[in-house]
Amino acid sequence: MLRCAVKKFAYFATFLTIVANIYIYTYPSFHPEQCSWNCSNKNAPLQKDLTFVDKVKNYFSDVREQWHGSHASAGNDEDIHILAFGDPQIKGIWPKTPYVSRLDTYGNDYYLGHIYDMMQQRLKPQVVTVMGDLFSSQWIGDSEFHNRTKRYISRIFKRDPTSIENIKQQNLDEKGQYKANWPEWGDRFNEILDNVKENEADNQELSFGFGYENIHSWNPDLEDFLIINITGNHDVGYSGDATYQHMTRFHDLFGKDNYWIEYETNTTHPWRIVVLNDLLLEGPALQPEFVEATWIFLNQLNERKFNGSTVLLTHVPFYKREGLCVDGPDTRYYPDAHAPESYKSGLLRSQNHLSESVSNQVLNMIFENGKPGIILTGHDHEGCETVYNKKSTSTWEATKNIESDVFVKEITVKSMMGEFNGNTGLVTGHFNTDSMTWEWTFSLCPFAIQHVWWFAKVSLLVTIFTWSSLLFV
């Protein structure tokens, strides 16, 4: 009797396990339009217009294409393919963290890693970018920052952590843990900053080394794509919080926070990636020299008079009126009696958007040539799509639709966290040989709430255990 009941349960558990695991390993095929690179076939019927039978056929057809790797080669070979992930915000584990929370944090790393694995294997992007807020808090010690970086690199993005381990060995404290050498980094930073300011009139770029050209991978021996990590407020803080310690450890473990990479500059279709730490554009700032350095970066970028298209990657969205996105404009400052950090009184504490004046300045400097481009941001976990239309007064107005001959799209990439359904942003850049301009399209590929991933994994363990138990009943 017991054996019969266990066997029935084993069959039921097996069925659920198969269904759940098929879903988590083929979920992009349930949204083939959203989870594939944009291609030139504009006549294909939309998924929402198909019958149920046609949707099922599309699903199996897409699974077959994924199995054979057809999605990675979809479209024109000259197209640009970028995967964008919003605000993973991975949490930490502390000595008093309950075991259930430890397990949840451990599983969350692999939930996020599953999303990346599926999309990377399916689409083989040229660029992968994470839109800031890599971690859940900037108020963590250096050793914890290193620990989370190692988890982030190895568990989520399956990269070799050897380089950050080497950095740790070069910067050990008395307990053998990583400690950011911010006095040395700060001295070097200020030496460079002073040098740039002295030679500003001569436009010499001997210092921060903001510019690169035709970089397709930071480590070509290990990776055939470029990965870019943007600074978020939970990584380095807003300008009223950002310290030398914050900036040193980010530079140590992730690299520069401001730079550009130019591609195809001697062709008819040049384009570039601009990485901007827009957390350090406004103040009042705790370290005003950080803001000064960011504006030096923008001035040097503007002086290049680049004539191609721009992909701008940054964290905080540009100014827009209330109602266009979930997050409206909201800027806050530390009060005068902010204990125990009275030295922060009046400094910038948080902002949902850049201010209107700074937004106009930055957009005019980066998109001065009037060429089509695209902006990718994070910060607003719900995501948003807007268009910035340039007016005759050199101001930019955010709307939902194109209202000007000169415009740029801003995509706030919806968070990849489980509570927001584990999203991936897909950007396709296609050069139109008729208009001789780049065209940029975006789609959002959702996965599912993290409990679905957990169910698939737990159900597999339950199924194995149940079938094994039949040996003893």
UniProtKB/Swiss-Prot annotation:
Residues 30-451 are lumenal. It comes from the Eukaryota. It is found in: Endoplasmic reticulum membrane. The keyword Glycosyltransferase does not apply. N-glycosylated. One of its GO terms (cellular component) is endoplasmic reticulum membrane. Keywords: Endoplasmic reticulum, Glycoprotein, Membrane, Transmembrane, Transmembrane helix. It is a multi-pass membrane protein. GO terms for molecular function: hydrolase activity. Residues 1-8, 473 are cytoplasmic. The chain crosses the membrane at residues 9-29, 452-472. CDD domains: MPP_Ted1. Its main location: endoplasmic reticulum. GO terms for biological process: endoplasmic reticulum to Golgi vesicle-mediated transport; GPI anchor biosynthetic process. Glycans are attached at residues 38, 147, 229, 266, 307. Present with 1070 molecules/cell in log phase SD medium. Acts together with EMP24 and ERV25 in cargo exit from the endoplasmic reticulum. This is Protein TED1. The gene is TED1.
